[in-house]
Amino acid sequence: GAGEKRGQNRIHLDLTTSSLDDQHDTVAHLLLLGGAHVDIGQGPDDTHVVLADPEGNELCIIEPTNRFLSSCPRLGAVNCDGTRELGHFWSAAIGWPLVWDQDEETAVQAPTGTGPKLTWSGPPLMPRLGDDRFHLHVAPAGGRRAQDALETLLALGATRSERQRCAGATAWRDVDGNDVCLVEEAR
């Protein structure tokens, strides 16, 4: 869940576009819905557009020439701040293959090769300014119990957290120290 906004979010969405007109129309539509342009340090040569939703949460409208997300649906990626080790952790934790592992950046995608990617941008990592506004929720797959899934996560390097952020979920921290909630079953 969302907490108080303190600086740039460590997780944001990347939306894909199919043409320059689509990128322009998507930006215009999101601005009509209350979005706003935001500067997160992008350069003048960047071809993606960075917006913030009405609550100030950043999202990127990706240019149509971006080949990395070209096979993804409109929600191209959930982009996370994190190390290369974190990408490998999540690949093992959820059983999705690494589809990118270069220059300390990593990404995973469902084994079918379809759907959005989970990406980690590598260093330098953003400063942690209190609680992250957003965090991942995971559910055990394939009829596994939450306790069995938690034991797997702990074996991969996750640690238990005393902090309970979500009702009905087990709180833990991934290998980069990010809050994660393990829910009993997919919702």
Question: What positions do the PLM features span?
Answer:
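Short, solvent-exposed beta-strand edge segments and adjacent coil->beta transition regions
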Residues: 8-12, 73-77, 131-135
